[in-house]
């Protein structure tokens, strides 16, 4: 039995210099799992709660000592002696003990760190890589694929101090034959984009997710400079590289209107903003749009799905917050056709796997995602491969908190070879 003998929680620092929770789970036989919780900037209102101390004298109120105390106290007491291989039971014990709908007693950051650390320790005790253990937990042993990356090379919105309203402009190296080649194409376009921006006298400082964060004349200009970079890098837009956007529209939804401050405070209704996006998809090969409307604008989302849903992938992030109850409602109402998967929106590995399964069973795609506040923890790489999710969103080609995930994917691809196909654009809904 992979019995848990010790659990340690500690406060560490994330990629934004804010504290987060790290957990260590020790098993009989000396096996250890180590995992850290990420943290978002543009968060959905229905996400599981990230517990912060609120003590302004430490880390400006962002300390996580309460969550760490939960790991070292009640959580440790509850899971010590339990079998780490029984992930569903470990997660259920913590969720039941917390006793709240949104994990506000211990914090999703505490529960998630222990959940992932337990999975890593269990994988070690079985003598297998984490992705292989995840595939077994998922009920799909031995079924793997390498995800198509969505690389966020221009950051706006809450991820950058610039005038760009749309939060992420991404490239997908769909012409690649392997994940490793996709990373190379992404890197070449990223570096070429720096040249394009410099030639225009624009900033090449990077945002939270490692993409450039220049001030631009409009949101469409972000697409134009990326298109120029793709061409200059020697690739064909639409064939070798496609585009994706995360609007994070909740962040610019004010009094029932979508207000683009970077475009002279232009205001749109749900229908108008849908057609604004539709026009962009006619000008550029955009194959995926995330959170194209506010998380509460379900009528608008239904309309957007009717207009765009058969042509492109419409991903719900703040809309669904990796929550099966909310996703189920979305599936029943025909809202969006894809879900963004973020561990810490729901707060445990078991619930994350349930959301991926529900999406796939309904014909929705699942995009595995980082958060804007990350650590060197690369678990999402193993999650993407182990669930054969097909797509991953883990930032740009800079900042080691982002690159850690790409490097882990490169290692996994090397280990699995033909057992983990890279399916490229075929993974994207509507393509």
Curated annotation (Swiss-Prot):
The UniProt entry's sequence similarity note says: Belongs to the enolase family.
Please name the pathway: Carbohydrate degradation; glycolysis; pyruvate from D-glyceraldehyde 3-phosphate: step 4/5
Manner of cofactor binding, per the entry note: Binds a second Mg(2+) ion via substrate during catalysis.
What this protein is called in its record is: Enolase
Q: What is the lineage of its organism?
A: Bacteria, Pseudomonadati, Pseudomonadota, Gammaproteobacteria, Enterobacterales
Q: Do the record's keywords include Magnesium?
A: yes
Write down the species.
Yersinia enterocolitica serotype O:8 / biotype 1B (strain NCTC 13174 / 8081)
KW S-adenosyl-L-methionine (keyword) present? no
UniProt-recorded Gene Ontology molecular function terms: magnesium ion binding; phosphopyruvate hydratase activity
Instruction: Please name the GO terms of the biological process aspect recorded for this protein, alphabetically.
Output: glycolytic process
Q: What does this protein do?
A: Catalyzes the reversible conversion of 2-phosphoglycerate (2-PG) into phosphoenolpyruvate (PEP). It is essential for the degradation of carbohydrates via glycolysis.
For this protein, the record's InterPro entries field holds:
Enolase, Enolase-like_C_sf, Enolase-like_N, Enolase_C, Enolase_CS, Enolase_N
The UniProt keyword set, sorted, is: Cytoplasm, Glycolysis, Lyase, Magnesium, Metal-binding, Secreted
Q: Which domain of life is it from?
A: Bacteria
Q: Which gene encodes it?
A: eno
| Residues that coordinate or bind Mg(2+) | 246, 290, 317
How is the subunit organization of this protein annotated in UniProt?
Component of the RNA degradosome, a multiprotein complex involved in RNA processing and mRNA degradation.
Looking at the UniProt record for this protein, which Gene Ontology cellular component terms does it annotate, in alphabetical order?
A: cell surface; extracellular region; phosphopyruvate hydratase complex
What is its subcellular localisation?
Cytoplasm; Secreted; Cell surface
- Active-site residues annotated for this sequence: 209 (proton donor), 342 (proton acceptor)
Cofactor(s) for this UniProt protein:
Mg(2+)
Sequence positions that bind (2R)-2-phosphoglycerate: 167, 342, 371-372, 393
């Amino acid at each position: 039995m992979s019995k848990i003998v010790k659990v340690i929680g500690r406060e560490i620092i994330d990629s934004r210099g804010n504290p987060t929770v790290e957990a260590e789970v020790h098993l009989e036989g000396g096996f250890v799992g180590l995992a850290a919780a990420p943290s978002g900037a543009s968060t959905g209102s229905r996400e599981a709660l990230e517990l912060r101390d609120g003590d302004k004298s430490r880390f400006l109120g962002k300390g996580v000592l309460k969550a760490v105390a939960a790991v070292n106290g009640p959580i440790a007491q509850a899971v010590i002696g339990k079998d780490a291989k029984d992930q569903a039971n470990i997660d259920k014990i913590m969720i039941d003990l917390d006793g709240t709908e949104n994990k506000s007693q211990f914090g999703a950051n505490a529960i998630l760190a222990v959940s992932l650390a337990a999975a890593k320790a269990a994988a070690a005790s079985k003598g297998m890589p984490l992705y292989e253990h995840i595939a077994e937990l998922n009920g799909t042993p031995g079924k793997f694929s390498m995800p198509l990356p969505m690389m966020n090379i221009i950051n706006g919105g809450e991820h950058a101090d610039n005038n760009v309203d749309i939060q992420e402009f991404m490239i997908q190296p769909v012409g690649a034959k392997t994940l490793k080649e996709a990373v190379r194409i992404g890197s070449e376009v990223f570096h070429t984009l720096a040249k394009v921006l410099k030639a225009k006298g624009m900033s090449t400082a990077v945002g939270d997710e490692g993409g450039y964060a220049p001030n631009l004349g409009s949101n469409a200009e972000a697409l134009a400079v990326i298109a120029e970079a793709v061409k200059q890098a020697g690739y064909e837009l639409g064939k070798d590289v496609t585009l994706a956007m995360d609007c994070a529209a909740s962040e610019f939804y004010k009094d029932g209107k979508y207000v683009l401050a970077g475009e002279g405070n232009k205001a749109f209704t749900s229908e108008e903003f849908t057609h604004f996006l539709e026009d962009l998809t006619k000008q550029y090969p955009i194959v995926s749009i995330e959170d194209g409307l506010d998380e509460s604008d379900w009528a608008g989302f239904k309309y957007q799905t009717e207009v765009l849903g058969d042509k492109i992938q419409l991903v719900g992030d703040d809309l669904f917050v990796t929550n099966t109850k909310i996703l189920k409602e979305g599936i029943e109402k025909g809202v969006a056709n894809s879900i963004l998967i973020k561990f810490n929106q729901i707060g445990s590995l078991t619930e994350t796997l349930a959301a991926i399964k529900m999406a796939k069973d309904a014909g929705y795609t699942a995009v595995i995602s980082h958060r804007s506040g990350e650590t060197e923890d690369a678990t999402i790489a193993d999650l993407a491969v182990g669930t054969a999710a097909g797509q991953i969103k883990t930032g740009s080609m800079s900042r080691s908190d982002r690159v850690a995930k790409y490097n882990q994917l490169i290692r996994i691809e090397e280990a699995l070879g033909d057992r983990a196909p890279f399916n490229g654009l075929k993974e994207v809904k509507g393509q």
